[in-house]
Design a protein with these regions (language model features):
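Terminal accessory/targeting
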Residues: 1-270, 354, 358, 365-470
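Catalytic domains of cell-wall/extracellular-matrix polysaccharide-remodeling enzymes
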Residues: 17, 25, 294-372, 418, ...
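Short, well-ordered alpha-helix to beta-strand connector turns
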Residues: 45-46, 283, 338
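Conserved hydrophobic/aromatic pocket- or pore-lining residues that grip, position, or stack substrates
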Residues: 199, 289, 333
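Metal-dependent polysaccharide deacetylase catalytic core of the NodB/CE4 family, i.e.
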Residues: 202-206, 219-229, 242-328, 344, ...
Length: 470
C-alpha cells in the first residue's frame, strides 16, 4: 500500500515536518510519498494531509477519506526559539499524554477524520531532543538530568511515547481506511531486535581497588559459597571475566558490540591486542568508546585519529559516562565520519531518551537539517540498576526489573539497546554470569535476534520507503 502525505504548511516548519515524517514512518512496510503539491498525490484513497487551520483542503468535500493533522500557529511559534513545553497544554488519549493538542474545538467537532493532536510536532519534539536545548540544569558531569525532562514529569521515561503516538495514528487509519500499518522485520525476521554491547572502561583494577569495590557494594553482594569462591579466584585473575562473557555469547550464538577506549595503559597492550584479534573478522563488532571529556573538550578528531590502527571497520561510537550535550555530540561525530551513535540514555533510569524504539536521525536546529549520524538510542545500562548514584538495586530485583522492562519493550517492536559493562561481573561473579545467561536465553526463546549496533545501522541504511516529491 502507498500512502500519500500532503504538506500544506509554511516553509518555516517544512524541514522539520519532512524530517519527522521520514523517521516515524521508516519502520513500516508501506511506501510513503511526501509532497507539497496536490497533483503529486496519486492515491486519493490513502492520503494524510498536514495543514494549517486555514487550509482549503480541510473543508473540501472531495477529501472525505483524507486523514487530517493540524499544525497550529502556536506550534510554529513554540519551535521558533528554545523554551520549556507547558505541561498544562496536554490532552490524554487512552491515558497517553499527547503534547500539541488541537485547541480549536469547532474543527474537532466538524471533522471526524481529524487527529486531535499534532503528531508531527509532538514526535519532532522528542526525536530531535528539542527540550534539552532549553534545560539549564546540569549534573556534576555536565549532563542533562532526567528529573528536568518532560519524560520524568509525565512518568513516561520507560514508555516509547512516539510509538504510542503512532499506535493512536494507526487506530485512526484503521477506522478510516480499514487497513493496518505493518512494521518491517528487523534482522532475524522478527519485529524486535536486541542490540547488545559492552564497554571496556578499564582492563583491570588493582587488588586494593577491587577490595574497595567489594566493600562499597556490600549492600548488593549475594552471600553464597559459589560467589565467595569466584571472589577469591578473581582476586588474582579479574581479566578472566572477558573470556567468561565471550564463552556465554558464543555458546548461545549471540553477538555483541565491544566499545574500546582510545587508549589504555601500556602494560595492557598485549591483552588489548589479543582482544582485538579475538573479535576481528567475526560477527562481533568493535566500536569506539570516546573518552568522557571528548565532546566537552572538542577532542573527537584527535581520538579518532588514534584508533585507526585498531580496526578499519570501526563505524560507531559511544561516549564514556554518557557525558555530552546533543548538538555538540552529533556535530563532532558527523564531522569525524562516524556512522552511528549509541549514547542516548539518561543514566538515572532505563528507558527512551528520544521516545522512540527505532533507530533514527537527530535534527540540528541550528543548521535546520538532520545530522548524518544515525542515533541508536541506548535503553538499558547495568550501571543504572546497580550503582548507588542511581537505582542501586539488589540482584534479585535487578533481574526482575530487567525482564519486566524487556518484556514490555518487545511489545513495541524496534531495537532494544542493552549495555552491560564487564565490571558488572566483578561483584557476585558466579550468580551474575548465570543471570546474564538466563536473560539472553529468555530473549532467544522469544525469537528475538541478539546482535550488534552495526547490524542495525546497516538495516536502517537500507530501509528506504519514503519518497519526497517537489
Amino acid at each position: 500500500m502507498t500512502i500519500s502525505i500532503l504538506l500544506d504548511i509554511p516553509e518555516s516548519f517544512a524541514k522539520q515536518a519532512r524530517y519527522t515524517v521520514e523517521n516515524i514512518f521508516s519502520p513500516y512496510n508501506e511506501d510513503f510519498v511526501v509532497t507539497d503539491k496536490f497533483e503529486n498525490c496519486n492515491n486519493e484513497n490513502n492520503r494524510i494531509v498536514y495543514c494549517m487551520e486555514s487550509s482549503p483542503y480541510l473543508h473540501d468535500p472531495n477529501f472525505k477519506k483524507d486523514l487530517y493533522i493540524i499544525l497550529e500557529n502556536s506550534s510554529i511559534e513554540f519551535f521558533s526559539h528554545f523554551k520549556p513545553y507547558d505541561l498544562n497544554d496536554l490532552s490524554y488519549i487512552e491515558k497517553i499524554p499527547c503534547i500539541f493538542p488541537l485547541k480549536n474545538n469547532e474543527i474537532l467537532k466538524s471533522n471526524r477524520n481529524l487527529l486531535p493532536f499534532d503528531i508531527i510536532a509532538a514526535s519532532f519534539f522528542f526525536l530531535s531532543c528539542w527540550q534539552e536545548y532549553s534545560i539549564g540544569n546540569r549534573d556534576k558531569k555536565g549532563r542533562v538530568p532526567l528529573k528536568s525532562t518532560i519524560q520524568y514529569k509525565l512518568n513516561i521515561i520507560r514508555k516509547p511515547i512516539v510509538n504510542e503516538y503512532l499506535r493512536i495514528l494507526g487506530d485512526y487509519i484503521n477506522k478510516l481506511w480499514g487497513t493496518e500499518l505493518e512494521h518491517k522485520e528487523m534482522p532475524g525476521e522478527a519485529v524486535s531486535y536486541v542490540s547488545l554491547s559492552h564497554d571496556i572502561c578499564w582492563i583491570d583494577i588493582s587488588l586494593k581497588k577491587y577490595i574497595k569495590l567489594v566493600v562499597n557494594n556490600r549492600h548488593v553482594i549475594v552471600k553464597n559459597f559459589s560467589n565467595f569462591l569466584s571472589a577469591v579466584r578473581y582476586l588474582w585473575s579479574r581479566t578472566r571475566i572477558y573470556k567468561k562473557v565471550y564463552d556465554i555469547e558464543e555458546k548461545l550464538g549471540v553477538f555483541s558490540t565491544i566499545f574500546l577506549l582510545t587508549e589504555y595503559p601500556a602494560k595492557y597492550k598485549y591483552f588489548v591486542d589479543s582482544l582485538i584479534k579475538t573479535y576481528c573478522g567475526t560477527n562481533f563488532e568493535l566500536a569506539h568508546h570516546l573518552s568522557g571529556m571528548s565532546i566537552m573538550n572538542q577532542n573527537v578528531k584527535q581520538e579518532k585519529a588514534m584508533i585507526k590502527h585498531l580496526d578499519s571497520s570501526i563505524c560507531g561510537e559511544r561516549v564514556h559516562t554518557l557525558r555530552f550535550d546533543i548538538n555538540s555530540l552529533f556535530s563532532q561525530v558527523e564531522m569525524n565520519a562516524y556512522n552511528y551513535d549509541n549514547s542516548l540514555l539518561f543514566p538515572e533510569d532505563m528507558g527512551y531518551r528520544t521516545g522512540f524504539s527505532y533507530p533514527h536521525y537527530i535534527f540540528d536546529p541550528i543548521k535546520k537539517k538532520p545530522f548524518k549520524v544515525l542515533a541508536i538510542p541506548l535503553n538499558i545500562m547495568d550501571t543504572t540498576l546497580v550503582d548507588r548514584k542511581y537505582l542501586w538495586l539488589k540482584d534479585e530485583s535487578v533481574e526482575k526489573e530487567l525482564l519486566d522492562f524487556i518484556s514490555n519493550s518487545l511489545n513495541y517492536g524496534g531495537v532494544l539497546s542493552v549495555l552491560i559493562h564487564y565490571s558488572f561481573f566483578l561483584i557476585n561473579t558466579k550468580s551474575r554470569l548465570e543471570m546474564y545467561e538466563r536473560i539472553l536465553t529468555s530473549l532467544i526463546s522469544k525469537g528475538v535476534k541478539i546482535g550488534t549496533c552495526r547490524e542495525i545501522y546497516t538495516w536502517r541504511d537500507k530501509s528506504k520507503n519514503i519518497l519526497f516529491l517537489k
